[in-house]
Amino acid sequence: MGNTVHRTLPDSSPPARLLATRPCYGPGPERRAVLGEAPRFHAQAKGKNVRLDGHSRRATRRNSFCNGVTFTQRPIRLYEQVRLRLVAVRPGWSGALRFGFTAHDPSLMSAQDIPKYACPDLVTRPGYWAKALPENLALRDTVLAYWADRHGRVFYSVNDGEPVLFHCGVAVGGPLWALIDVYGITDEVQLLESTFADTLTPLRLGQARLSACPPPGSHDAANFDNNELENNQVVAKLGHLALGRPDAAVPCVARERPRPASSPALLDAELRFHATRGPDVSLSADRRLACAPRPDGGRTLVFSERPLRPGESLCVEVGRPGLAAPAAVAFGITSCDPGALRPSELPADPAALLDRKEYWVVARAGPVPSGGDALSFTLRPGGDVLLAVNGRPRGRLLCVDTSQALWAFFAVRGGVAGQLRLLGTLQSSSETMTPSGSFSGSQDDSDSDMTFGVNQSSSASESSLVTAPSSPLSPPVSPAFSAPEPTGSRNGECTVCFDSEVDTVIYTCGHMCLCHGCGLRLRRQARACCPICRRPIKDVIKIYRP
């Protein structure tokens, strides 16, 4: 018999998962560096606009705002913190650094495999997990650290601050490489020495915030829409993080806090949220606090328990004090009794309510600069809905038909700051309300008419969120037009330009509130609607008076 050569067959099983083992440390600032080679950027697997220094520790994006995707040259261990310093930040672009992990080996990627953006291009593929750093945290010399644990949860912290949970469901059965997209205002980043993340106790896990930054642009929106399953997992596991029980729910607890200084002292606190609500929003036991923990918001519509009364101001607090507010508030008025609705019928986007037969009017109540702001919405007897922010009048937001019962509703923006608190209501005894009496200000405020401001600054799809009547209606004489009697001319001024005389009737609703020039321009807009009753405009007809 001849000699037999024994060959070792190549192991086709996936490589063993790297797990960073370390002694237990008590609380404190002490950190221990990870043994072994510090991570560097992969020299070949990078976007076409990325330039690396000689040590592959510093990545700089040249030209444009994209094509800045990079990876680490080696897998990252579990609990190993990927630490980045933001070396250069350039204002002017929209969006900031994207970061996360991938289960795909960058060494096997070709230049064609690396797209312009990590979000949404990469995260829509299996095996990629990344999200955006909020722009308000993307400051020069900021140190970002992020890591994955053995449960597939990903946390990040800024400047050694408290951990923020921003992903669940990451596959940790195989190697994970760090994914870093030098995007937007972030021009240059530097990889620092890795350290171990402290093991989070159940108490600290309960305090770990859920990441939520509002998508400011179309590419950012993919951070919240690209991986619905993972976002659901985040919410599903929050109770487990906080309480150590897989079946625990995330409570929405109304804690006593001082009333915002800008809100009136004599608010009536009898009004609560209606029990009918979207499936992705929870209410406190007293139904005065609505919480939406999901970063993407989801279906979070909430309604007032009863219809608003003419002359009544509804006061709410948006977000959490000290945290950036999630986004602009979506506020609306409807003639539909919430008790007749099923939670499954409530959409994520209030615009979808356009298909219903009831009377629905929706507006965006402007950007909220910070969490804890107090907003008031005043329904005047004539149909005007006035907005005030922290006691400052912002003008008219809507004009509605007060001949029927009208409930208020909100879409609660999701995330760590995603909550809406009912502060109470204030009833005015007079039809003409003052800023101090109504908490909403005068219609003559310098911020002008919010209804038209929203329409002019928003896209066509947002400018006229109102349902058409289910059956043809005869032209009504609306109280919303007659109550705030215009001044300056016999026929009144156009409610758009406030210059020309009203000489046009809107078909089919019959309202007269426009000059002919503004009427023609308004009719040419997509989904044009009457400024008073918000019904669709089919035509505008000029009238002649003797």
Curated annotation (Swiss-Prot):
Report if keyword Kinase is assigned. Answer: no
The protein's location, in the record's own words, is:
Cytoplasm
Give tissue specificity per the record. Answer: Expressed in the limb buds and dorsal root ganglia. Expressed in brain and kidney and at low levels in the heart.
Stretches of Low complexity bias are at 457-471
Q: In which pathway does it act?
A: Protein modification; protein ubiquitination
Q: What is its main location?
A: cytoplasm
One GO MF term: zinc ion binding
Alphabetically ordered keywords of this record: Cytoplasm, Metal-binding, Notch signaling pathway, Phosphoprotein, Repeat, Transferase, Ubl conjugation pathway, Zinc, Zinc-finger
Q: What is this protein called?
A: E3 ubiquitin-protein ligase NEURL1B
Gene source species = Mus musculus
